[in-house]
């Protein structure tokens, strides 16, 4: 291809902008406007006549502002019309019936405010463990009764089933001894799986035998410390069995013609289901031992729904009375807990049975301190303080069930009954754990009096004060009692010698102190904690509780000037000696500061404290720190930096940024934030001075620019550095620091050759060329207004950049280099205009410096011709079959560039554009729709006064037809 000269067309930017502006259309009042609130008319319609095609309606309308999606409803929707035609009396009756049904359902279903058993299960298993050896009886199975004829009479079948059960009770089992706790748990899991397998293979009697065997284990208290966990494991099997039986009977009521509703009555159940249900209850009734008979029947209690409406309400009192026959108080209380659990699942409205369980328990409560239990504890070598904590899981559950939506009078009666019993610390603790926090809080002084009267043997008072503190964290006591409550509690807590007992109580009461008192009281509490936890480095064993204390304090003190004026707060932080814990605490503090600090601050107390906190976080970073952790720490430190403002004292602000740079040099995102902050500071200075810098402010902005220039090279990310060089150069230019701006731009140009072929983006390696193209396009936009340095040649920076682009090693099949050259052509065309498209205030760009000088324009055109030659040479290399589509696309792109920026009155340039048009279509690779729209645009432009020469060009641009 021949060499083509370049001639830029003269642009009148103001006229072009005016021609592109959208036409302003006056909007009359009442017309639609996208930001106008939408109103929907709600029509209440009364139907008068349905005959014929005409019907009259009367409606009243009301308008309201609603969401845009509602605007599609115009008038009355069909459902409203049906509702309007309904008979009012029938409608009222239906609504009343629905309301009664809903109220009934509300009483028969436990709400989400009731804490389920599953929440407590994991805690019990984790807490009640043992290292002693355990034993278990495993069911070995029996072959008796499997052979027989199908013609056996019903009575013989029943006899056979009973014999099978007798066979089980007579010894078809194997006792495994000396099991560890984990072995025991594994065996229980095996039994659970055996139950499911037996059921799936239709061996119902075997399944029942397994459940009976498991239930018997609940009468064994030989390893008493493990009993609560054993109860959880065994009742899981019972729950599985109860669910299998219920679903089996329920499935019998479902056939292809009918489906049993969720709230069915016994009349809905068929005879087969009822007979099967009775059969299960008869089998269970034949179990001789009390404990397995009780547990297995309780597990299928829900099946009574198939037999009678009153079945459950009749069975619950009977089962409650059965528990009276269990002599061991621990076994008895857990049996009551299971019955309450099943009762709450199937009939939560039957409160009488729950209450009866509680009052029966109170009658037998003194057994806990009786001789039988004491002798058992002596045999097992268990002390009373270790024995009594076995009761709370069961007692707390019973109390929770009873107190759920219970009237105030019942709770008061229960509290009074507990008060009358001697040695009632255990009861009192369960009352405070299960009753509503509001109930406890309003009677705080009464409970403190009861706690004082408790005998401390077996159940220490500090645990009672801890339970009271947990309630007071949720509900407020009477204002007049608050200080006295704190004093009474802290008298007991501060006397505790054991650091673990002390911190477990103190952690709870810190929240009460923060909630209701000032920093003076909080400081006193923190000082007491430091006093108790410092000796023998006791704090090392209590980091979780100490962390909770910090979280509670910062949750209630959102004013950080007040928080850091608490004298003992920072010494409290010094107890966190373990680095990982200390960093977590610092993260909590910074997170709270970012969330709750509303206004920027310059308070020296806050700044010094938080700089120390941030420094602690920063210094924890090492070579093994994960990227996610670095991001989190950087986010928190950046949040702090953004909230520091010294107002108009810009020099102090810059000093803070200098100090921060020295403290946080290992976190790149923090350094990036500091550079942005300093650039913003320079621009704020410019804004204050309205662009007219004094000698002092000029020196200050140069200091800001120098800060950025020094900091950027320390960053690792190459595109981060490139973009910050560009951004900082723009800031320097805006503040008339021309030599510093040149230094930034030169640094950016010298960095381009270092851009690697692939870069890491979010953990994935991606080609870098598209990112480089984006950066260079932004750079070109800035270079338009950068004035030439008087000691260097014309367009020195552009020439340097072109040399770098030329020498850069591009991908073999990449066209990014040519796209960049096309952008350079746009830049040079803009530089040749008499007046540039945009300027920086008080900075003379080349249009002012050269004033359209012919030498400058000649140099500019020469560069354009060089760039064009590079583009045309690349197009020539794409004449291969596999690259024809790329050639077509690039050719059309270059054509559009010439059309937009070139002076097509020049014959050679005009001919080049025609050649490019033909090249784009030569091999049928062009997008016809794009070509058509381009030609339409040319014809439209040709109608403008100074663009008539495009008419002739349009005639020379044929459209390729496809046949």
UniProtKB/Swiss-Prot annotation:
Complexes and interactors? Component of the heterotrimeric retriever complex formed by VPS26C, VPS29 and VPS35L. Interacts with VPS29. Interacts with COMMD1, CCDC93 and CCDC22; associates with the CCC (COMMD/CCDC22/CCDC93) complex which contains at least COMMD1 (and possibly other COMM domain-containing proteins), CCDC22 and CCDC93. Interacts with WASHC1, WASHC2A and WASHC2C. Interacts with SNX17 and SNX31.
Region annotation Disordered: where it falls in the sequence: 43-69
Annotated source species: Homo sapiens
Principal location class: membrane
Q: Which residues carry this modification: Phosphoserine?
A: 265
- Biased composition range(s): Low complexity: 53-69
* Protein topology in the membrane: Single-pass membrane protein
Q: What name does UniProt use for this protein?
A: VPS35 endosomal protein-sorting factor-like
Q: Which UniProt keywords apply?
A: Disease variant, Endosome, Membrane, Phosphoprotein, Protein transport, Transmembrane, Transmembrane helix, Transport
Q: Biological process GO terms, please?
A: endocytic recycling; Golgi to plasma membrane transport; protein transport
| Biological function | Acts as a component of the retriever complex. The retriever complex is a heterotrimeric complex related to retromer cargo-selective complex (CSC) and essential for retromer-independent retrieval and recycling of numerous cargos such as integrin alpha-5/beta-1 (ITGA5:ITGB1). The recruitment of the retriever complex to the endosomal membrane involves CCC and WASH complexes.
| Annotated TM spans | 703-719
**Similarity annotation:** Belongs to the VPS35L family.
Can you tell me which residues the record assigns to a coiled coil?
Answer: none
UniProt GO cellular component terms: endosome; ficolin-1-rich granule membrane; plasma membrane
- What InterPro entries has UniProt attached to this entry? VPS35L
Location in the cell reads: Membrane; Endosome
Please indicate which superkingdom the organism of origin belongs to: Eukaryota
Lineage, please?
Eukaryota, Metazoa, Chordata, Craniata, Vertebrata
Provide the disease association from the record: Ritscher-Schinzel syndrome 3: A form of Ritscher-Schinzel syndrome, a developmental malformation syndrome characterized by cerebellar brain malformations, congenital heart defects, and craniofacial abnormalities. RTSC3 is an autosomal recessive form. Affected individuals show cranio-cerebello-cardiac anomalies, coloboma, microphthalmia, chondrodysplasia punctata, complicated skeletal malformations, periventricular nodular heterotopia and proteinuria.
């Amino acid at each position: 291809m021949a060499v083509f000269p370049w001639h830029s067309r003269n642009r009148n930017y103001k006229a072009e902008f005016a021609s592109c502006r959208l036409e302003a259309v006056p909007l009359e009042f009442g017309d639609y406007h996208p930001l106008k609130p939408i109103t929907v008319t709600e029509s209440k319609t009364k139907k008068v006549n349905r005959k014929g095609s005409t019907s009259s309606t009367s409606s009243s309308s009301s308008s309201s502002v609603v969401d845009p999606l509602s605007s599609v409803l115009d008038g009355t929707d069909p459902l409203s019309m049906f509702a309007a035609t309904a008979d009012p009396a029938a409608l009222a009756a239906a609504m009343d019936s629905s309301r009664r049904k809903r109220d009934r359902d509300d009483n028969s279903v436990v709400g989400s405010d009731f804490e389920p058993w599953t929440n407590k299960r994991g805690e019990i298993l984790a807490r009640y463990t043992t290292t002693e050896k355990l034993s278990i009886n495993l069911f070995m199975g029996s072959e008796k009764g499997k052979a027989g004829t199908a013609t056996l009479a019903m009575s013989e079948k029943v006899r056979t089933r009973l014999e099978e059960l007798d066979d089980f009770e007579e010894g078809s089992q194997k006792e495994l001894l000396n099991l560890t706790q984990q072995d025991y748990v594994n065996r229980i899991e095996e039994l659970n799986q055996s139950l499911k397998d037996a059921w799936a293979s239709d061996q119902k009697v075997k399944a029942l035998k397994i459940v009976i065997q498991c239930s018997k284990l609940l009468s064994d208290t030989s390893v008493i410390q493990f009993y609560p966990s054993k109860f959880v494991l065994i009742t899981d099997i019972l729950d599985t069995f109860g669910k299998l039986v219920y679903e089996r009977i329920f499935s019998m009521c479902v056939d292809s013609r009918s489906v049993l509703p969720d709230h069915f009555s016994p009349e809905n159940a068929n005879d087969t289901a009822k007979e099967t249900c009775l059969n299960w209850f008869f089998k269970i009734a034949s179990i001789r031992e009390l404990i397995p008979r009780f547990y297995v029947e309780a597990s299928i209690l829900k099946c009574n729904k198939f037999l009678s409406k009153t079945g459950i309400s009749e069975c619950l009192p009977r089962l409650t009375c059965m528990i009276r026959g269990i002599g061991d108080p621990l076994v008895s209380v857990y049996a009551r807990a299971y019955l309450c659990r099943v009762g709450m699942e199937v009939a939560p409205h039957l409160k009488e049975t729950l209450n009866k369980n509680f009052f029966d328990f109170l009658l037998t409560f003194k057994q806990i301190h009786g001789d039988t239990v004491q002798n058992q504890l002596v045999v097992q070598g268990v002390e009373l303080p270790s024995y009594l904590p076995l009761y709370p899981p069961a007692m707390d559950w019973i109390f929770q069930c009873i107190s759920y939506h219970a009237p105030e009078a019942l709770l008061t009666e229960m509290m009074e009954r507990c008060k009358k019993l001697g040695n009632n610390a255990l009861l009192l603790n369960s009352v405070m754990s299960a009753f509503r926090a509001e109930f406890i809080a309003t009677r705080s002084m009464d409970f403190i009096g009861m706690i004082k009267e408790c005998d401390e043997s077996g159940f220490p008072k500090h645990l009672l004060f801890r339970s009271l503190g947990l309630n007071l964290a949720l509900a407020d006591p009477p204002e007049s009692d608050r200080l006295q409550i704190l004093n009474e509690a802290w008298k007991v807590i501060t006397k505790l010698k054991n650091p673990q007992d002390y911190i477990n109580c103190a952690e709870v009461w810190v929240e009460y102190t923060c909630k209701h008192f000032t920093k003076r009281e909080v400081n006193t509490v923190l000082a007491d904690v430091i006093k108790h936890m410092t000796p023998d480095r006791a704090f090392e064993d209590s980091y979780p509780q100490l962390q909770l204390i910090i979280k509670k304090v910062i949750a209630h003190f959102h004013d950080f000037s007040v928080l850091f004026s608490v004298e003992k707060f920072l010494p409290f932080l010094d107890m966190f000696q373990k680095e990982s814990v200390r960093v977590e605490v610092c993260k909590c503090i910074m997170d709270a500061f970012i969330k709750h600090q509303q206004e920027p601050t310059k308070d020296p107390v806050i700044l010094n404290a938080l700089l120390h906190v941030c420094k602690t976080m920063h210094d924890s970073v090492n070579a093994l720190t994960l990227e996610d952790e670095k991001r989190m720490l950087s986010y928190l430190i950046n949040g702090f930096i953004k909230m520091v403002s010294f107002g108009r004292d810009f020099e102090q602000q810059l000093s803070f940024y200098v100090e921060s740079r020295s403290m946080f040099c290992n976190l790149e995102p923090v350094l990036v934030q500091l550079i942005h902050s300093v650039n913003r500071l320079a621009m704020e200075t410019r804004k204050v001075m309205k662009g007219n810098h004094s000698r002092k402010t000029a020196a200050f902005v140069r200091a800001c620019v120098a800060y950025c220039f020094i900091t950027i090279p320390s960053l690792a990310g190459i595109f981060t550095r490139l973009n910050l060089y560009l951004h900082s150069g723009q800031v320097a230019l805006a503040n008339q620091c021309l030599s510093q701006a040149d230094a930034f731009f030169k640094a950016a140009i010298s960095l381009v050759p270092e851009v690697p072929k692939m870069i890491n983006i979010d953990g994935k390696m991606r080609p870098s060329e598209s990112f480089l193209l984006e950066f260079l396009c932004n750079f070109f936009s800035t270079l338009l207004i950068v004035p030439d340095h008087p000691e260097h040649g014309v367009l020195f920076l552009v020439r340097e950049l072109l040399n770098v682009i030329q020498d850069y090693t591009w991908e073999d099949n990449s066209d990014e280099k040519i796209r960049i050259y096309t952008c350079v052509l746009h830049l040079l065309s803009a530089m040749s205009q008499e007046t540039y498209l945009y300027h920086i205030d008080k900075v003379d760009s080349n249009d002012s410096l050269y004033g359209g000088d012919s030498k400058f324009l000649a140099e500019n055109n020469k560069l354009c011709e060089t760039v064009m030659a590079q583009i045309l040479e690349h197009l020539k290399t794409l004449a291969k079959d596999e690259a024809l589509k790329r050639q077509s696309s690039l050719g059309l792109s270059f054509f559009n560039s010439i059309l937009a920026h070139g002076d097509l009155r020049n014959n050679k340039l005009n001919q080049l554009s025609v050649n490019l048009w033909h090249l784009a279509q030569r091999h049928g690779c062009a997008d016809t729709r794009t070509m058509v729209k381009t030609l339409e645009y040319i014809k439209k432009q040709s109608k403008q006064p100074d663009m008539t020469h495009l008419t002739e060009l349009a005639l020379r641009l044929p459209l390729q037809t496809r046949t």
